[in-house]
Swiss-Prot record:
Subunit structure: Interacts with MDH1.
Function: Thiol-disulfide oxidoreductase involved in response to pathogens and oxidative stresses. Required for the response to victorin, a phytotoxin which induces programmed cell death in sensitive plants. Possesses insulin disulfide bonds reducing activity.
Location of the protein in the cell: Cytoplasm
Domain spans labelled Thioredoxin: 2-113
Keywords: Acetylation, Cytoplasm, Disulfide bond, Electron transport, Redox-active center, Transport
Any single GO BP term: response to oxidative stress
Cystine pairings recorded for this chain: 39-42
Gene Ontology MF terms in the entry: oxidoreductase activity, acting on a sulfur group of donors, disulfide as acceptor
Record flagged with keyword tRNA-binding: no
Cited Pfam families: Thioredoxin
Family listed: Belongs to the thioredoxin family. Plant H-type subfamily.
Name of the protein in question: Thioredoxin H5
């Protein structure tokens, strides 16, 4: 798995299945950013999401391009980008639709994303 503080970009189903299985087994909170290269709000939130990954080192952060992995986007019922899905042990526990930095931050705190000490 990627090191702590990184966003794991999955470009194939094989990589996604392997990485999400490892993350689920770790019992850590998982946040998936469903994004698209043509989506301006997605481009706006991407560096913010990367900073969150550095800040919340006990959370596993994924990035999925909906055009590359349509099957995964459909499985998670993604209808707008960006959509952020929060999971624990394979279960969806929350979601945020839109580039809502504060709401994403609140959900990270709510679901156990402990902030690393600086």
């Amino acid at each position: 798995m990627a090191g702590e503080g990184e966003v794991i970009a999955c470009h194939t189903l094989e990589v996604w299945n392997e990485k999400v299985k490892d993350a689920n087994e770790s019992k850590k909170l998982i946040v998936i950013d469903f994004t698209a290269s043509w989506c301006p709000p997605c481009r706006f939130i991407a560096p913010v999401f990367a900073e969150m990954a550095k800040k919340f080192t006990n959370v596993v952060f994924f990035k999925i391009d909906v055009d590359e992995l349509q099957a995964v986007a459909q499985e998670f019922k993604v209808e707008a980008m960006p959509t952020f899905v929060f999971m624990k042990e394979g279960n969806i526990i929350d979601r945020v639709v839109g580039a809502a930095k504060d709401e994403i931050n609140e959900k990270l705190m709510k679901h156990g994303g402990l902030v690393a000490s600086a």
